Design a protein with these regions (language model features):
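Short, leucine-enriched amphipathic alpha-helices that occur as contiguous helical runs
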Residues: 6, 10, 21-23, 103, ...
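Short, charged phosphate-coordinating catalytic segments
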Residues: 29-52, 143
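DNA/chromatin major-groove-contacting recognition/catalytic segments
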Residues: 157-175
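Basic, Lys/Arg- and aromatic-enriched nucleic-acid-binding interface segment
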Residues: 3-34
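Short, basic (Lys/Arg/His-rich) helix/loop patches that form interaction surfaces
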Residues: 108-146, 150, 166, 172-173
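Short, charged amphipathic recognition helices of the HTH superfamily
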Residues: 35-36, 41, 92-93, 99, ...
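Basic, alpha-helical nucleic-acid-contacting "clamp/cap" segments
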Residues: 50, 59-96
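Short, basic interhelical loop/turn and adjoining N-cap
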Residues: 45-49, 101-102, 149-158
Length: 175
């Protein structure tokens, strides 16, 4: 279990982040299981602002499945603050309004968080933690394969196996 970040650990990590960008990176990679490439391409136009929540429209690159996620509570405030400064076609993850961040900057943000927490944090580890908690919730391995385009064997199967052996306990993700 120590190999995977729990939702509580991610909440703690988000509270210790130095920037909104780091919080958004953690939220997107952990809560929705996005890849680094998918996170870098998110535009502010993919979010629909409502009075108490945001709707986030997203299509997975690998599987082509489209989703609409509801973002609310403290994460709503975080995204609303960032989105209110952007035009529809500007990327959400950016250094300043006119300079989107690169893969290297995103990985540096994760490294900075790892230094703060004195623990290794990678995008792959965040995705594996996302899968672990989904499987622990009771999502089947077949659903994971269909949704994320997972390999039928190897690491994803071991994550599923580990989640099944630990029982079904579901602390809510970040919402």
């Amino acid at each position: 279990m120590n190999d995977y970040f729990s939702p509580e650990e991610i909440r703690t990590l988000m509270s210790r982040c130095e920037s909104d960008r780091q919080r958004i990176i953690l939220f997107l990679l952990y809560n929705y299981g996005l890849t680094v490439e998918e996170a870098l391409e998110i535009k502010s136009g993919q979010f629909m602002k409502k009075p108490d929540y945001l709707l986030f429209n997203f299509t997975r690159k690998l599987t082509g499945k489209s989703h609409t996620y509801k973002i609310q509570y403290e994460n709503y405030r975080l995204f609303y603050k960032v989105l209110s400064k952007l035009q529809d076609q500007e990327t959400v993850l950016h250094k300043d309004r006119h300079l989107p961040i690169s893969d290297t900057i995103l990985r540096k943000d994760l490294f900075d968080l790892a230094v703060i927490m004195n623990r290794k944090i990678t995008s792959a580890q965040l995705f594996e933690s996302h899968l672990y908690w989904l499987f622990k919730k009771g999502v089947s391995f077949a659903q994971g394969v269909e949704e994320y385009g997972l390999a039928l064997s190897g690491k994803p199967f071991k994550i599923w196996e580990s989640a099944m052996l630990s029982g079904r306990l579901w602390p809510f993700l970040l919402e």
